[in-house]
């Protein structure tokens, strides 16, 4: 079985599959992805494969520069997005935005 290239919390699976979540915000450990990369996607909880995505772009962002567009691309409110990022990456301020499209 092929390993997954990137994982998402299971709660985001349906939004990714439906095209409602089109970015992911990660820390430096996952800053190596680039436009054109095709990635196997698994669930964080069990590493079960659920789709393939293509990276369409990358950029950097800080917690303070997250905006409504980022929130919309994550399919959540801006306050919720900032809270989720702060929970996942406590004490970090520099992040990497990975834009993607689901290929199935």
From Swiss-Prot:
EC number(s) per entry: 3.5.1.135
UniProt KW keywords: Hydrolase
Coiled coil regions in record: none
Protein name as annotated: N(4)-acetylcytidine amidohydrolase
InterPro entries listed in its UniProt record: AC4CH, ASCH_domain, PUA-like_sf
Keyword Nucleotide-binding applies: no
Catalytic activity: N(4)-acetylcytidine + H2O = cytidine + acetate + H(+); N(4)-acetyl-2'-deoxycytidine + H2O = 2'-deoxycytidine + acetate + H(+); N(4)-acetylcytosine + H2O = cytosine + acetate + H(+)
Chain's gene name: yqfB
Function: Catalyzes the hydrolysis of N(4)-acetylcytidine (ac4C).
GO cellular component: cytosol
NCBIfam families in alphabetical order: PRK04980.1 (NF003443)
GO molecular function, one term: N4-acetylcytidine amidohydrolase activity
Positions annotated as active site in the UniProt record: 21 (proton acceptor), 24 (nucleophile), 74 (proton donor)
Family per similarity comment: Belongs to the N(4)-acetylcytidine amidohydrolase family.
Domain (ASCH): residue spans on this chain: 6-94
Lineage of origin: Bacteria, Pseudomonadati, Pseudomonadota, Gammaproteobacteria, Enterobacterales
């Amino acid at each position: 079985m092929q390993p997954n290239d990137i994982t998402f919390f299971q709660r985001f699976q349906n939004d990714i599959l439906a095209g409602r979540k089109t970015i992911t915000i990660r820390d430096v450990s996952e800053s190596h992805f680039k436009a054109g990369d095709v990635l196997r996607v698994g669930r964080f909880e069990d590493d079960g494969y659920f789709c393939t995505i293509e990276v369409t772009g990358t950029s950097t962002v800080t917690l303070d520069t997250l905006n409504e567009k980022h929130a919309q691309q994550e399919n959540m409110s801006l306050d919720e997005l900032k809270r989720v990022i702060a929970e996942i990456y406590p004490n970090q301020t520099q992040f990497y935005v990975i834009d993607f499209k689901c290929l199935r």
